[in-house]
């Protein structure tokens, strides 16, 4: 569960997830700020973070604990479809079979599976 509360600055929000807190913000029509990520960037961050953790777990399972992982996620919001594009980077690079095994774990990451399903929104 995440709780979000509007702050006094226009469009600035403080949110809490468990014991962790952070801010989000946006600018619309010249109003607002940049004290934190914009809401859609939080979606990108959730996916990139989960994919990175999944990749790290796969690498540890393979005994490749010295391989660095980064995932870049970009959200493309169109009228008919919302598309998440992602790039998995392993440093130093691994062989193709290992890369494909890590990429499969990334494709099966929990947040990617969640966002890939039909979504419904309803009041609590």
Segment roles from a protein language model:
Residues 1-45, 53-124:
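Extended beta-strand/beta-hairpin segments
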